[in-house]
């Protein structure tokens, strides 16, 4: 199956609670590549690449996040990103 990339913007109480770390771990567990990073406005940006099914699994996970977080909203942006990420980084 063809690899796709998606960008997600996660809002809520998602910084300072290990959200990027847990997202990286979940991404690797799902066989995805990409990154998670904190944004200046308090949101977290996640870019992930993999099969559509695995991206959907990550999207569903992001809506809950780790127990330490309180996710208010996850926006999924269509992405034409074509980057060959190695692993799942925290930026």
Swiss-Prot record:
Matching PROSITE patterns: ACYLPHOSPHATASE_2, ACYLPHOSPHATASE_3
One of the record's GO molecular function terms: acylphosphatase activity
Domain annotation Acylphosphatase-like: ranges: 5-91
Keywords noted in UniProt: Hydrolase
Known EC number: 3.6.1.7
Reaction(s) catalysed (UniProt annotation): an acyl phosphate + H2O = a carboxylate + phosphate + H(+)
Broad class of enzyme this protein falls into: hydrolase
Active site location: 38
Recorded superkingdom: Bacteria
NCBIfam families the UniProt entry points to: PRK14426.1
Family: Belongs to the acylphosphatase family.
Cited PANTHER family: ACYLPHOSPHATASE
Annotated protein name in UniProt: Acylphosphatase
Organism expressing this protein natively: Vibrio cholerae serotype O1 (strain ATCC 39541 / Classical Ogawa 395 / O395)
Name of the gene encoding the protein in the UniProt record: acyP
